[in-house]
């Protein structure tokens, strides 16, 4: 693992859930503006942040097994060097695992959905199925897939509340994503996040 960067916990701002739900859309076009570290922090916390001293997170997890790992390809975030980072929820920090950003490679592996390459960040949500299946057997696969859906919705809602756009991308070649990131977990979802073109 590379350098560790602590990222500030988000300030919780008042926003009506109903407003965010009404405004939530899938967005595939992003302008060239960078994200701020604060915005990155909010997105990661919403995805899988720790919410209390017992280790519970922002999403429900069968038996609190928390089988997911969140990686983020950083192309353009103010104050953060480009590269691929792993999110460490327990410390609300990111650790760089690749020195270069791989947005173009991710886009090609995702059936040439090139908007992925343009996004300032791309979340890669991957699963270590064994954390859940060793407790629940084959039913654990279902629970893992439910959990990634919870993460995706949280990212959608946080992005919307910040005036950003995102989309869930499930069309990609799994093994290519694993090879690009050099990870052992199984990728389930890509979520590019950026500023919407108005």
Swiss-Prot record:
PANTHER family hit by this protein: NITROREDUCTASE MJ1384-RELATED (PTHR43745:SF2)
InterPro entries: Bacteriocin_Proc_Enz, Nitroreductase, Nitroreductase-like, SagB-type_dehydrogenase
Cofactor annotation: FMN
UniProt keywords, alphabetically: Flavoprotein, FMN, Oxidoreductase
Organism: Methanocaldococcus jannaschii (strain ATCC 43067 / DSM 2661 / JAL-1 / JCM 10045 / NBRC 100440) (Methanococcus jannaschii)
Enzyme class: oxidoreductase
Gene Ontology MF annotations: oxidoreductase activity
Family: Belongs to the nitroreductase family.
Enzyme Commission number: 1.-.-.-
One Pfam family cited in the UniProt record for this chain: Nitroreductase
Protein name: Putative nitroreductase MJ1384
């Amino acid at each position: 693992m590379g350098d560790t960067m602590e990222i500030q916990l988000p300030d919780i701002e008042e926003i009506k859930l109903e407003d965010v739900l009404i405004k939530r859309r899938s967005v595939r076009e992003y302008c060239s503006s960078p994200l701020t570290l604060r915005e990155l922090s909010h997105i990661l916390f919403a995805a899988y942040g720790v919410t209390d001293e017992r280790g519970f997170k922002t999403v429900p997890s069968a038996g609190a097994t928390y089988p997911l790992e969140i990686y983020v390809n950083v192309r353009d975030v103010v104050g953060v060097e480009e590269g691929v980072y792993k999110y460490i929820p327990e410390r609300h920090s990111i650790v760089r695992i690749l020195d270069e950003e791989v947005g173009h490679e991710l886009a090609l592996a995702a059936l040439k959905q090139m908007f992925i390459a343009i996004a300032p960040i791309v979340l890669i949500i991957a699963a270590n199925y064994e954390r859940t299946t060793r407790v629940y057997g084959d039913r654990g696969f279902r629970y893992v897939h439910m959990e990634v859906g919870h993460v995706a919705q949280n990212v959608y809602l946080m992005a919307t509340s910040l005036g950003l756009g995102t989309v869930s991308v499930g069309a990609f070649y799994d093994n290519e994503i694993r090879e690009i990131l050099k990870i052992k977990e199984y990728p389930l979802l890509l979520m590019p996040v950026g500023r919407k073109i108005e």
